[in-house]
Design a protein with these regions (language model features):
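Conserved C-terminal helix/tail region of periplasmic/extracytoplasmic solute-binding proteins
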Residues: 307-334
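Pocket-lining segment of extracytoplasmic ligand-binding domains
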Residues: 163, 171, 179-271
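Short, surface-exposed acidic
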Residues: 60-66, 165-172, 273-284, 314-320
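Positively charged n-region of N-terminal signal peptides that target proteins for export
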Residues: 1-3
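Generic structural signal for alpha-helix termini and adjacent loop/cap motifs
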Residues: 83, 101, 189-190, 261, ...
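N-terminal export signals
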Residues: 7-24
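Short, glycine-/small- and polar/acidic-enriched structural segments
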Residues: 25-167, 172-176, 193-199, 223-224
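Secondary-structure end/capping motifs
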Residues: 238-314
Length: 334
């Protein structure tokens, strides 16, 4: 009987361990980001260890956040779907494509925006003053042909300028380049004479004589609009509710830091980005009124409607809340 009792206790203990293991949240959360000041809020989250702090406050004291840097939104999407990372940061169009494709399976949802700062198309071609002047010899560098935020913004601008049927008018002019490589090409007199840019590359490009603006995402949106969001899978959300909440709280705190302490925000960017910019330069960039960082989703349905109309996504979301986790529904999004 003693042996049997010990066996029962051992069995119960094992069951308890299995149960605890099955319900335990992850102790390492991996987040994929891309280069540039677009990701400033995430840089702050990384530098100040905000996920670890908020997770500890929620009863998860041993959490560690790892940040992985990838070149383009499609790479981020692939990393999330494969399970290589838990949370991705990508443009609204790449996310919408993934959201449409994974409904009923992986079922991705947006967690938070990470900025509403403008994406800006610049050129060094003196003959091109507006997008209507772009010709067959021009080449536009952007992070992903046909799929990135910049690519879809260019299509939306083409549809507005030439009619809906002409939305792909500029697609043959586009080439895939990460922002650092695109800036180098633009300023080195290569065949690439246009770059759909973002900070801090934009400010460095515009400092060069002859480089000028053709189009901004603000023009396309008709005002500030979310250009990037963080997202994750149903599997991660259901298995890690405290981590999900900790991440959202971390992003909210990071946005407050940007508005209340730009110096600290600039220090975080310089510390983790690898960009060879001074803290003073970065602080001046993010102090520009056009650099909008906020947690409220804006304009996502406008992009979704365009992508649905062109057939890029097969499902039209009922409203912006269909795209985001329920924790975000209290915001006045669009």
């Amino acid at each position: 009987m003693k042996y049997k009792r010990r066996g029962l206790i051992a069995g119960a203990s094992a069951s308890l361990l299995v149960s605890r293991s099955a319900w335990a949240e992850k102790d390492t959360v991996r987040i994929a980001v891309q280069p540039g000041l677009t990701y400033l809020a995430l840089n702050i989250v990384e530098h100040q260890h905000l996920i670890e702090q908020h997770a500890a406050a929620a009863g998860l004291p041993n959490v560690r956040a790892e940040f992985v840097r990838l070149a383009a939104g499609n790479n981020v999407n692939d990393a999330v779907i494969s399970g290589a990372v838990d949370i991705g940061a990508t443009g609204v169009p790449p996310f919408l494509t993934l959201w449409s494709k994974t409904r009923g399976s992986v079922d991705v949802r947006a967690m938070t925006p990470y900025n509403s700062m403008p994406l800006v198309l610049v050129t060094r071609n003196p003959a091109v003053k507006r997008i209507e002047d772009l010709g067959p010899k021009d080449r536009i560098a952007l992070p992903g042909v046909g799929s990135s935020s910049q690519a879809v913004m260019l299509q939306m601008a083409a549809a507005r300028a030439f009619g809906q049927a002409e939305f792909r008018r500029f697609d043959p002019l586009t080439v895939t380049r990460g922002h650092p490589d695109a800036m180098a090409a633009l300023l080195s007199n290569t065949e690439i004479d246009c770059h759909f840019s973002t900070a801090p590359y934009l400010q460095q490009e515009l400092a060069v004589p002859g480089v000028h603006v053709l189009l901004t995402s603000t023009d396309v949106y008709g005002g500030p609009g979310t250009v990037g969001i963080t997202f994750t899978t149903k599997k991660f959300r259901e298995a890690n509710p405290k981590l999900e909440a900790a991440f959202i709280a971390s992003m909210d705190q990071a946005f407050r830091t940007i508005h209340e302490d730009r110096r600290a925000a600039a220090e975080a960017y310089v510390a983790v980005s690898g960009d060879k910019l001074s803290i003073e330069q970065v602080e001046s960039y993010i102090s520009d009124p056009s650099m909008v960082y906020e947690i409220t989703p804006r304009g996502t349905m406008k992009v979704a409607a365009f992508m649905y109309k062109t057939g890029t996504i097969k499902v039209m979301p009922d409203d912006w809340k269909a795209l985001f986790v329920s924790e975000m529904w209290g915001y006045a999004g669009s």
